[in-house]
């Protein structure tokens, strides 16, 4: 598919009903692994016993950046064997706008992402830039654990 065909298709989806991903379980092991990689071992994230005693949440809380790092997986954008549009050379995470964490994400929770395309435009280098509104929901919790505008770019082999 050409960049122009993808642009036309994406423009028709701007503002459409949000897509909803599948549920994903957030284990303490995943949180601990993220703490190891980022060198952020604050007790509120990794100390199960202490959080049970001293935290207002009663359980470890995942790092906000942990939640952000899961957005490509939660939105299904990381599927190299199933490209959204044939002809894409690569997809780039270009950044995030307006990130907030309205509710803590506790170890043992299940989350999923709601994604709505907000805008799409052409960019140099045979690419398209998209902005998606992303809301990460926690099962059984009214407030989301994360809301953000995700900026990504698609670059095509040819036009």
Model-derived segments and spans:
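HotDog/MaoC-like acyl-thioester-processing domains
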Residues: 1-15, 19, 101-159
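Hot-dog-fold acyl-thioester-processing enzymes
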Residues: 2-93, 159
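A beta-strand/beta-hairpin structural motif
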Residues: 94-98
